[in-house]
């Protein structure tokens, strides 16, 4: 599948092992490269649902500005945020913040939005995906166990849906499960397919 993309060098601009795993599931050849360091800042007035797409674009621009884009490069960048009560929960700085985030999510429904940017030297395509996730009530003991065993400090909202906490606490997901993991692969596949057919 996606034979039209074989002329491109597909690069996943992300250090995330979850995004690497998900992109691998599309059976396309790619390489994973760490992105240049960027401050994940965004304009204060920006709609919260638009933040991940803004950051995905920033990551692509950082890659481009370092002269890392060749004519054959097809770069995929992404960013995922958790939103609850109009507040973005990013990656926790420490255990205390992670526990606070999980207590906030406990017994409630929150939104997960992933923004994805596909960049070629002369073209950029961007899209986002939103899912709703409902948590069961989490006890302090369950939160402590999860943080001790899984240390989710590299994850937005302090949890990985594919981990232990997902098995015991996720009551419902409305929308893409893989979006919650960090990459809406069904949309990405269609965008890559369309890109290959039109270029």
Curated annotation (Swiss-Prot):
Catalyzed reaction equations: dTTP + H2O = dTMP + diphosphate + H(+); UTP + H2O = UMP + diphosphate + H(+)
Cofactor(s), by name: a divalent metal cation
Molecular-function GO terms, alphabetical: dTTP diphosphatase activity; UTP diphosphatase activity
Enzyme Commission no: 3.6.1.9
Secretion signal, residue range per the UniProt entry: none
Any single Pfam family the record assigns to this protein: Maf
Membership in a protein family: Belongs to the Maf family. YhdE subfamily.
Name used for this protein in its record: dTTP/UTP pyrophosphatase
Organism: Porphyromonas gingivalis (strain ATCC BAA-308 / W83)
């Amino acid at each position: 599948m996606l034979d039209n993309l074989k002329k491109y060098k597909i690069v996943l601009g992300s250090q995330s092992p979850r995004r690497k795993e998900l992109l691998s599931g599309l059976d396309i050849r790619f390489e994973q490269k760490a992105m240049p360091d960027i401050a994940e800042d965004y304009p204060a007035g920006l709609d919260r649902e638009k933040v991940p797409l803004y950051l995905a674009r920033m990551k692509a621009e950082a890659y481009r500005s370092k002269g890392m884009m060749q004519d054959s490069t097809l770069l995929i960048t992404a960013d995922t945020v958790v939103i609850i009560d109009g507040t973005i929960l990013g990656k926790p700085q420490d255990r205390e913040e992670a526990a606070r985030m999980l207590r906030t999510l406990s017994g409630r429904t929150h939104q997960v939005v992933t923004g994805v940017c596909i960049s070629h030297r002369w073209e950029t395509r961007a899209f986002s995906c939103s899912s709703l996730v409902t948590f069961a009530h989490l006890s302090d003991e369950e939160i402590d166990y999860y943080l001790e065993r899984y240390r989710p400090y590299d994850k937005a909202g302090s949890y990985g849906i594919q981990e232990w906490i997902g098995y015991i606490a996720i009551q419902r997901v409305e929308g893409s499960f893989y979006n919650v993991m960090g990459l809406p692969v069904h949309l990405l596949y269609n965008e890559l397919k369309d890109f290959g057919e039109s270029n």
